[in-house]
Amino acid sequence: LPLLIYVDGKEYHDGIDISPGELYQRMRLNQMEVKTAAPTVGQYYQAFKNSIEGGAKEILCVTLSSKLSADYSSAKNAANLVKTENPESKIFVFDSRRAAVPQGLLTIEAAERLNAGQPMEDVLTYLENAWQKSSLIAALDTLEYLNRGGRIGQAAIYVGSTLRILPIV
């Protein structure tokens, strides 16, 4: 499911209503308020139910890091709701503990392994081992977007700008 992106209060679905390139370009050109939100429990619930009703025997959902987003929590709660109604359903929610490219690569590899016929248990073991070997380091050239996204306050911007400190995340 796509993340929800709010640009000046208007809702977009990541990669559907707005592309990353378009979002970044608009952010650079305008002083917009941009917020993100995880898909809701209800959205995950509906996606899981639709997949089961469509004949899925097993569902694997690889989420953004639970330390960065409510994505994992929403998916896990929805999976539990579906399992309560349909105890034989097999829904596996995996916290990638990653975001961006590392999460995407883990997800693609898991899908390829499942499509090649590997058992779900083996794919989950792979994911549990592989996430620890992946990382993403980003050097930021401005604190502006961290502030706009609500990650840091004005005091942090003042100190960072005054001392010319930029984070590596």
Which residues does each PLM region occupy?
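N-proximal short alpha-helices
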Residues: 16-21, 51, 55, 96, ...
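Short catalytic-loop micro-motif centered on adjacent basic/acidic residues
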Residues: 35, 61, 93
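Mixed-charge interfacial surface used for oligomerization/domain docking
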Residues: 1-10, 31, 67-84, 89-92, ...
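N-terminal glycine-rich anion-binding loop in soluble enzyme alpha/beta folds
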Residues: 1-43
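N-terminal glycine-rich phosphate/adenylate-binding segment common to multiple enzyme folds
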Residues: 43-72, 79
